[in-house]
Amino acid sequence: MIIIKLLVIGCDGQLGKEITKILSGENTYEIIGTNKKDLDICNFKEVDDFILKHKFDVVINCGAYTKVDLCESNKEKAFLINSFAAKNIALSCEKTGAKLVYISTDYVFDGKKEGPYYESDKINPLSIYGKSKALGEIYTKMFSSKYFIIRTAWLYGDGNNFVKTMLGLSKTKDCISVVNDQIGSPTSTKDLANCILNLINTENYGIYHGTCNGFCTWYDFACKIFELKNINIKVNPINSNEYKCDAIRPLNSVLYNHMLKINNMDNFRDWQDSLEEYLENI
């Protein structure tokens, strides 16, 4: 039996946890997971030594600085983790011939397009977070020849996320306000993890969009959460300019899984179905 050596960087994040959980039941994988305490991905020598020592077949880079508003005031940290660390990992993977997965975001787009974004659409990030992830994409393409860049959006799983925030607010408030002029596709880490694990068994390298099917506003998302959990709470729809935050968000974050569909690999469920399953298990 061939054993695949796989590294999950950022194993304690939502997606990293899901990938590790799914693979823990597979006897064809030898998995090592690292967090920022185990491996400083911003230190090239440390990354290089670690990857060369273990000679991984696949490296999944889930490590990121995802606090979108804090990125605006911590620009150096954002680029260090989201861009230059991605470069370190890509350089080391290329030395060993490892396949590399880089998780990217809908924030690389400006949200001004009418209709969903395809992988081939021009990127134009509005925020520091989006710009740092866009540069991470560039470095990944530049220094790795076996890369899968997967852009996703509105992710939820085992950790802090919009779903947990809404459920938490419902315990202390009778009425909340939620943005209703930004659209996107709520995406389960379970669906995304399965997509990644299918991709790494191929050599169909390139950029992919990976989100659940369908789209909604944050307001619609919140209402569906409360509906599925039978929670009685008033939800007020508001515009983005009424919700004060440091980073500009794209109004249209809908990604079309075009490349997955071309490769017959789009196994994402409708966002409502994935959400219902998630809520049944938390």
Provide a role label for each language-model segment:
Residues K5-S24:
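N-terminal Rossmann NAD(P)H-binding glycine-rich loop of SDR-like oxidoreductase domains
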Residues I9, T34, V59-G63, L100-T105, ...:
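SDR active-site strand-loop-helix element
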Residues E30-V47:
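Adenosine-cofactor binding site in Rossmann-like domains, unifying the SAM/SAH pocket
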Residues F44-I81:
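NAD(P)H-binding glycine-rich loop region in Rossmannoid oxidoreductase-like domains
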Residues L80, F84-N88, K95, V108-I150:
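Catalytic helix-loop patch of NAD(P)-dependent Rossmann-fold dehydrogenases
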Residues I138-P186, K190-D191, L197:
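NAD(P)-dependent short-chain dehydrogenase/reductase
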Residues C195, T202-A247, L251:
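Mid/C-terminal beta-alpha module of Rossmann-like enzyme folds, strongest
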Residues T217-Y219, C223, N239-I282:
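Conserved C-terminal active-site "lid" loop/helix of NAD(P)H-dependent oxidoreductases
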